[in-house]
Amino acid sequence: MIKLLTIIGARPQIIKAAAISRVLREKFAGQITEHILHTGQHYDDNMSDVFFRELGIPAPDYNLHVGSGSHGVQTAKIIEGVEDILTEQHYDGVIVYGDTNSTLAAAVAASKIHVPVFHVEAGLRSFNMAMPEEINRIVCDQLSSLLFTPTKTGLQNLQAEGFDSIKCRVKFADGRGQKVVLSGDVMYDNSMYFSAMADIKSDIIERMGLSHRNFILATIHRPANTDNPENLRNIFRALNDIAEKHQIDVVLPLHPRTRKMMGDDRMDERIKIIEPVSFFEIIRLEKNARVVMTDSGGVQKEAFFYGTPCVILRPETEWVEIVEAGAGIIADADYDRIIAAYEALAGKQVHFPQFFGDGHASEKIISEIMDYLK
């Protein structure tokens, strides 16, 4: 029996882990046992517990409760906590997701004591080393035994860095080497699985009096925007003026901390500021919006999956396929660019090619892990 430890620390990682956990239970029961460790990097009822319940995955077996802190403090606490668990309990491998401090710390802790690391969403690059996430993903890829990249662009990024999808690049202590796998995207698996379910489980469109393709969904969470008063002001001003000029509602789920930073500026009555939403609620909003405006990588992708164009409120994106397809426009936190991007996307026919696999990435990932551990 293979024994795996899945390590998560933030809400998007719960969503990604749900796809693999579901397939493990449904198709690999009796062959693989999975335990879940939540680092507590981001943990409250809205951000985590609700998602476990909605996604139907087991509550974590471990929670490190590290909480917030500087990058160094948070990462160090997670390394220590993961190392303690991996030395007390035998695991054949560790699955990590994405690019958070939890991802980095888990990869460091596991690799130091020679437990194989399997990185889901490997190979993504923004080429912006000012982003903590860019540092995390680069280091994690170097330490991983299996690198599961969701797109051809991710594969090309890894090949440019010297990784090879066939030959082992380096050897670990157990004599096994690294392997890059073009797996497809587990979030696309989820989008196909949960789309119809969200229509049944959530009534947010009806409850808010919204109509199909007649509102904007905006999400803002990155510190580069939320901790920068000028950026935040530019984004809010652009949303306000778009709502007023185009007579369109803007749904804006905001963390209370970000809401406080808005100040007392007058906002158009069409700006609908609400509390952070559940998993099924965000799906329904993404599916029905005319345009999504976001600084979230995950929301960019989900909008694409559901055929909704996206204004990207960042200076770059890891998901370059979305921009190259014309389904997303990078506007950063620039007032004029946000206005122009919205008007360009709202008024044109947009195509959504199938860049992200066939909806069976999770099965491919698990099969590769089993082959690796034979």
What are these regions, as identified by a protein language model?
Residues 5-10, 14-29, 51, 63-175:
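Active-site and donor-binding regions of nucleotide-sugar-utilizing enzymes
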Residues 40-58:
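N-terminal beta-loop-helix "entrance" segment that forms/cooperates
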Residues 41, 49, 197-288:
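Donor-nucleotide binding loops and adjacent catalytic segments primarily
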Residues 42-46, 143-231, 331:
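A nucleotide-sugar donor-handling region in carbohydrate enzymes
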Residues 52, 153, 329-374:
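Leloir-type glycosyltransferase catalytic cores
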Residues 82, 86, 284-289:
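Short alpha-helical donor nucleotide-sugar binding micro-motif in glycosyltransferases
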Residues 96-97, 108, 119-120, 147, ...:
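A donor-sugar binding/catalytic signature common to diverse glycosyltransferases
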Residues 273, 304-351:
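Nucleotide-sugar donor-binding patch of glycosyltransferase catalytic domains
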